[in-house]
Amino acid sequence: MRASSSNGTTPWSWRHPSRYFQRNHRKLLVIDERELFLGGFNIRLENSIGLYGEGRKRDTHVSISGDLARHAAALFDQMWQDAEHPYADFATEEGTVFDPFLVPSFSCLGWKRIACLYAGLIERSAHRVYITTPYFCPGSIVDTAVRQAARRGVDVRLLVPRDSDPSFVGWLTRSGYSRMMAEGVHIYQYVAPRKLHAKTAVIDDEWCVIGSPNLDHLSLLVNHELVLIARDPGLGSALTEQFYRDLADASEVKPNAWAKRGWTERGLEAVGWTARKIL
């Protein structure tokens, strides 16, 4: 067994100071270049059904076999090299495009790549967009696509935790509620004892997005992330059914009730709105 000398972060360098804030946020397992597992699932105690039972985190992971596993192995090797030699210049190859396909972000090499793909799928939606994410403060590209889709009559639903971890991230998410609901976006807060950690989207029961990125600036613009995009009605149906099951453990935020929230909450959201651009 070999372990990388990196702990998922990049050491400080005066030549590359911005890279200090980057981290490897991917959740990827590849077995013999035959099968890959990816999504939001971390290998940690909080995900153990034996230790936490029904209190474990609510997450989504997917398993895929075939050529895509070899592509995932190549992406892993590239990240391993970057961890061992963080400031070396490595040539990158796009590789073969598969359906479904993997979308990596390498910060400066893939700046806004995942955000643009997310927004592009939402912009092409015709009937419904169901998004599950622990944090929703994605920046203007995705935020605008979500609101415009709702405005043109698409059934847009956003599932986020009621209680965020850490708590202040909830201020960032909630600071955008009013604007989204004004455009017709339906917002649901997950209230089950389990913490919501899944990062998925399903568009028109057909296009599916599963991976490691949260819909926030750190994931979309800074971190090393990996996402699967698939046009698969079978997977889309499964994700839609899971979304409906999650809604049974969620409560919808109603615009009239939201307008009556207290000034303390409004003040915290104002702080969150200001911080959205950096977090």
Residue ranges of model-derived segments:
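Charged, low-complexity intrinsically disordered terminal segments
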Residues: M1-L279
